[in-house]
Design a protein with these regions (language model features):
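PLP-dependent class I/II
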Residues: 1-260
C-alpha cells in the first residue's frame, strides 16, 4: 500500500533514520495491541486495512471492524479493505467482508484477489467493490472508477476470466476447499511446532501465514540468515513489511506437507 502511494507521488519525503514517509500515517500491528491497529490520532484521507492480515496472519472480529467503519464515516475517510485471505477464515466471529458492518457502503471499498483463494498468483485476477453510496463530498466514487476503468482497461484476458468462472463451479469450490484445508494443516503444523519449541507465534488459524518473534534479540535479517544457513529454510524478514515488522518473521503454509 505504501509503495503504490510512493509511485503516485503522495507519500511525501522519506526519512532513512525512521524508515517512514512524511505523508503516511503508520498504524503499528504488534503483540502489544494484539496485531489490531488502533485508531490514528491524525485524520487520514484513506485507511488501508487487510484482514486476515498479511504478514501477521491475524484477523479481527466484526465488532472490531465496526469501530473502523464508524470512525471512517465520522471523519470522512475512505477505507480500502483488502480481503485477499478471506477464504482462510475458520472462526465464526471473523467477517469475510467489510460490508457485514453497518454503514460500510458509505465509507469502504473492498478488494479481493483470486491469488490466494485459488492459487492464481501471476494470473492477475481480482475484483473491486465500490458501492454507489460511497461519496467524497458530492462526488460518487463509483462513477469516477467506472470512467477511469473504462478508459484505461479492457478487462482481464478471456482465458483468465474462464479460470475465474471455474472457481465458482461445483468442482472448483470443492477443489479449493480441499486445497485450503491442506494449507491449514501446514499452518497448524508450523504454528504448533514453533510454539512447542518456545517461540512466540501468531496467525495460522484464519490465515496461511505464521508470524513469529525472532529469538535471542536477533533482527529480522539476522534470523533470515540463521534459518537459511542452519536449516535451509527460507522465510520473509518482518522488516520488509514496515517499521513495526522489525524483530518478527513470516513463515508460509504455501508448500507441501512433506517440506513443511
Amino acid at each position: 500500500y505504501v509503495d503504490t502511494n510512493v509511485m503516485a507521488g503522495r507519500a511525501g519525503d522519506y526519512n532513512p533514520a525512521t524508515e517512514r514517509f512524511s505523508n503516511v500515517i503508520y498504524m503499528p500491528c504488534t503483540a502489544e495491541n494484539n496485531f489490531c491497529p488502533e485508531l490514528p490520532k491524525e485524520t487520514p484521507d484513506i485507511i488501508y486495512l487487510c484482514f486476515p492480515n498479511n504478514p501477521t496472519g491475524e484477523a479481527i472480529t466484526k465488532e472490531q471492524l465496526q469501530v473502523w467503519v464508524d470512525y471512517a464515516n465520522k471523519t470522512g475517510a475512505v477505507i480500502i479493505y483488502d480481503a485477499a485471505y478471506k477464504a482462510y477464515i475458520t472462526e465464526k466471529d471473523i467477517p469475510v467482508s467489510i460490508y457485514q458492518c453497518e454503514g460500510a457502503k458509505t465509507c469502504a471499498i473492498e478488494l479481493c484477489s483470486f491469488s490466494k483463494t485459488a492459487g492464481f498468483t501471476g494470473l492477475r485476477l481480482a475484483y473491486t467493490v465500490i458501492p454507489k453510496e460511497l461519496k467524497c463530498g458530492d462526488v460518487q466514487l463509483h462513477a469516477l472508477w467506472a470512467r477511469r476503468h473504462g478508459t484505461k482497461y479492457n478487462g482481464a484476458p478471456y482465458i483468465i476470466q474462464r479460470a475465474g468462472e471455474a472457481v465458482y463451479s461445483k468442482d472448483g469450490k470443492a477443489q479449493i476447499a480441499e486445497q485450503i484445508a491442506y494449507y491449514h494443516k501446514n499452518a497448524s503444523y508450523i504454528f504448533n511446532g514453533l510454539k512447542e519449541a518456545g517461540y512466540t507465534v501468531a496467525g495460522g488459524v484464519n490465515s496461511p501465514y505464521v508470524w513469529l518473534k525472532t529469538p535471542d534479540q536477533m533482527n529480522s535479517w539476522e534470523f533470515f540468515d540463521y534459518l537459511l544457513e542452519k536449516a535451509n529454510v527460507v522465510g520473509t524478514p518482518g522488516s520488509g513489511f514496515g517499521p513495526s515488522g522489525e524483530g518478527y518473521f513470516r513463515l508460509t503454509a504455501f508448500g507441501t506437507y512433506e517440506n513443511t
